[in-house]
Amino acid sequence: MAVYAVTGGAGFLGRYIVKLLISADDVQEIRVIDIVEDPQPITSKVKVINYIQCDINDFDKVREALDGVNLIIHTAALVDVFGKYTDNEIMKVNYYGTQTILAACVDLGIKYLIYTSSMEAIGPNKHGDPFIGHEHTLYDISPGHVYAKSKRMAEQLVMKANNSVIMNGAKLYTCCLRPTGIYGEGDKLTKVFYEQCKQHGNIMYRTVDDNAVHSRVYVGNAAWMHVLAAKYIQYPGSKIKGNAYFCYDYSPSCSYDMFNLLLMKPLGIEQGSRIPRWMLKMYACKNDMKRILFRKPSLLNNYTLKISNTTFEVRTNNAELDFNYSPIFDVDVAFKRTRKWLEESE
């Protein structure tokens, strides 16, 4: 029976991973490691779940928290393209924090690491080039924001660490998973968009080109892919060692506006008029200045305007081929759960 650690386990994705691990037969203990205290800690009658408050940049505390762990699912990150955090803060957590986790793996002899990367480790790039493809599709990877850069650098770090020698001459095996835009109950961004629509009289004003298609994935399916990868990476001859995979399911691929409308229309949200691009650009520039001068974050800035209007569509089944992944939640269930959460959070 194994001991698993989930860094960022109090977060949106991390919490769902912890929930699914409760049903994993080979897991005896789950250590939930996060810098914040979970206001609603998950409990279980069949698994030992220990919550440990810890900064992943503090090596000594990380080492103490991970002592005795067999496998790490490393989800901890600052996910920010809105200007809430400084570039240094984002890089410190996402890149240097991952360095700390890898150093602990080497020092403690932890043999398996599943890393939550991001689609932004690949794109959309700073040129606004569309991406339609899979894990092996050629694409100009040129991050346009420090968040994307930090996830790219951390992914490369984790991939390079695969098959490296750790304590007692054992080997470390790693795998990276790249969620596309995650949605579901607990998604703060979806909640913000819903609240904005309510404030505008149940109208969703359109800000995104209808042709800018984006792949999405339900949080429960992204979490399941992590749990499944954690199982398969321990098999001798496993194909996933040293590889990266996009997280996907059968959620609609469409523009952000159209996706939100599909999700929220049963809640009474109606499609509104399109805001002119010149006006969006003007507000984006204004918000960028506020961020620079006053550190005021904003959903609309030049970076978010560009990436939301740039196609990033994943077409792959590599996770199915290499570790037998298939979604465990269909789209109807995912949408119903998300809608229920939105209604209850009003």
UniProtKB/Swiss-Prot annotation:
Induction: Expressed in the early phase of the viral replicative cycle.
InterPro entries: 3Beta_OHSteriod_DH/Estase, Lipid_A_modif_metabolic_enz, NAD(P)-bd_dom_sf
Keyword list, A-Z: Early protein, Host-virus interaction, Isomerase, Multifunctional enzyme, NAD, Oxidoreductase, Steroidogenesis, Viral immunoevasion
EC number: 1.1.1.145, 5.3.3.1
Keyword Cell division: no
Gene3D superfamilies associated with the record: NAD(P)-binding Rossmann-like Domain
Pathway it works in: Lipid metabolism; steroid biosynthesis
GO molecular function annotation: 3-beta-hydroxy-Delta5-steroid dehydrogenase (NAD+) activity; steroid Delta-isomerase activity
GO biological process: one example: steroid biosynthetic process
Residues at the catalytic site: 147 (proton acceptor)
Positions with a binding annotation for NAD(+): 151
Cited SUPFAM superfamilies: NAD(P)-binding Rossmann-fold domains
Reaction it catalyzes: a 3beta-hydroxy-Delta(5)-steroid + NAD(+) = a 3-oxo-Delta(5)-steroid + NADH + H(+); a 3-oxo-Delta(5)-steroid = a 3-oxo-Delta(4)-steroid
Domain of life: Viruses
Role description: Catalyzes the oxidative conversion of Delta(5)-ene-3-beta-hydroxy steroid, and the oxidative conversion of ketosteroids. The 3-beta-HSD enzymatic system plays a crucial role in the biosynthesis of all classes of hormonal steroids. During viral infection, steroid production contributes to virulence by inhibiting the host inflammatory response.
Family: Belongs to the 3-beta-HSD family.
Protein name: 3 beta-hydroxysteroid dehydrogenase/Delta 5-->4-isomerase
Protein source organism: Vaccinia virus (strain Copenhagen) (VACV)
